[in-house]
């Protein structure tokens, strides 16, 4: 590895430490208190004259003023000032601090606690040690790494210099923990299903493909867990859920990452109305846990999860916004003729269902700011959902939308094996016609349905987008620790 000038200077300091018999990467630390513990009990510890040992990374500039020196160190729990005097610390380590230690080094310091004349809590250091010498200097503006792509490529550095980023991922953990507790308390059983699958299904997406050498078989990283969870409903589990990574070989943008986290749950003897109530209760619980209130602010918009969510029908909303009645234009060509005649600026899609989805995505969804259930999806887009009895072109399905962003998907699940077989055959014809996101025939899943699956409601929630909402982040990359990026050129 070729080192630049600043790295070489730091390497020389490391070698001086080693030459003096000091291990710059010792195996153990002597820490007695976190910085947060010291700050929380500062006055009591100070009054007792208790010796503490803290450890952390040197942040900010070090100051050396004759026989005194100052630095701040930071651990995950907080930041505190170190006060070093040549008399208390001794010549050797005072000189080492001055000459051989740098910003970003990880150190430990022992001493008693006092406040400075300005009232700042400080450790008056009597012993010091190096725990990890940093060979990389901080970025130019160490207090804030601002290049967005570099922040995502070097998330470790982003977490060092932008402490607020750590708060995003603490909130993410709170959301996942709260979601688990919410489902557990309602009698759902957490399960695990295969990541490598012989047939991909449960969503309309392109898969990632790998190969099992021993079995001489192509396998797919899962694009959803739906079909396995519904097999469990057939098997007699009445409420199941899984929180897992799923993988879709698709583009990367503000709300999409090829690897993302989903929560899927299924409830026997329920339908999509039950799933709506579950979603309303879940997001109210998340808001209260994260913010203490049912309201949040996302990108300047105040969102209220307290009231019942609005219901919006796709055909009615498209008619209101564009003047096109999709239920009167149930073939692709007449629908696209109407789009052209109306001068609507949307991409022309292969398939009536996809064209309806495009109209809704462009002309309706961006305006849905408050929590909304989007209902009445075309059956062509929903091969796993039960048809509406009164309108066979549509299904019992909803997508929860908040701040113009789809955050999930839910159905009354299709449990008729004969209807499901016909849907799979239609998907196969679409695939043969060039739709590479069409779903595949899954004979084993059909066999499971033939044993009988009770009426079932199913729900999938995008955890990454949910975290975006509750942390007010504009991009999915900000809520994934290590998002996928293009290779460096």
From Swiss-Prot:
Q: Where in the cell is it found?
A: Cytoplasm
GO cellular component terms?
Answer: cytosol
Swiss-Prot/TrEMBL catalytic activity: tRNA(Lys) + L-lysine + ATP = L-lysyl-tRNA(Lys) + AMP + diphosphate
Q: What InterPro entries does the record point to? A: Aa-tRNA-synt_II, aa-tRNA-synth_II, aa-tRNA-synth_II/BPL/LPL, Lys-tRNA-ligase_II, Lys-tRNA-ligase_II_N, Lys-tRNA-synth_II_C, NA-bd_OB-fold, NA-bd_OB_tRNA
Q: Which domain of life is it from?
A: Bacteria
* Cofactor(s) annotated in UniProt: Mg(2+)
* Pfam assignment, any one: tRNA-synt_2
Which terms are listed as keywords in the entry? Aminoacyl-tRNA synthetase, ATP-binding, Cytoplasm, Ligase, Magnesium, Metal-binding, Nucleotide-binding, Protein biosynthesis
Q: How is the cofactor bound?
A: Binds 3 Mg(2+) ions per subunit.
The keyword Ligase appears for this protein = yes
Report which gene this protein is encoded by: lysS
Q: Which residues bind Mg(2+) 1?
A: 399, 406
Q: Which GO terms describe its molecular function?
A: ATP binding; lysine-tRNA ligase activity; magnesium ion binding; tRNA binding
Known EC number(s)?
6.1.1.6
Q: What is this protein called?
A: Lysine--tRNA ligase
Q: Which GO terms describe its biological process?
A: lysyl-tRNA aminoacylation
Gene3D superfamilies recorded for this chain? Bira Bifunctional Protein, Domain 2, Nucleic acid-binding proteins
Residues involved in Mg(2+) 2 binding: 406
Q: What's the subunit arrangement here?
A: Homodimer.
Q: Which family does it belong to?
A: Belongs to the class-II aminoacyl-tRNA synthetase family.
